[in-house]
From Swiss-Prot:
One of its GO terms (molecular function) is protein-disulfide reductase activity. InterPro entries: Thioredoxin-like_sf, Thioredoxin_domain. One of its GO terms (cellular component) is cytoplasm. This is Thioredoxin-like protein YusE. It comes from the Bacteria. Pfam families: Thioredoxin. Keywords: Disulfide bond, Redox-active center. The gene is yusE. Disulfide bonds join 26-29.
Amino acid sequence: MKELQEHELDHIEDDVYLLYLYTPFCGTCQLASKMLTVVKEMLPDVAFYQNNVNYSPTFAKAYQIESVPCFLLFKGGKMVERGYAFHSVSYLYELIKQKSSSASHL
């Protein structure tokens, strides 16, 4: 996953993308990152990015990030899913696949 800085977060141009938010010393975040790496390979039409929220306080506040790990899924410039529970690779795959191909929004 490509690491983005805070100033880049509002300028992503992909139609469908997932933004993974983490902190480096979070053990659960490390596991979630490995899961997303697998899912990324299975969903080539979805762009995957990551951001260390320690360096993005304005973004975290604007999107009301409550904890990490967290993912935000965007489609057509709008957030369509926010998740804190990563469950499993199959859960993430199905959720991202369904949300990225449907017209549903939060």
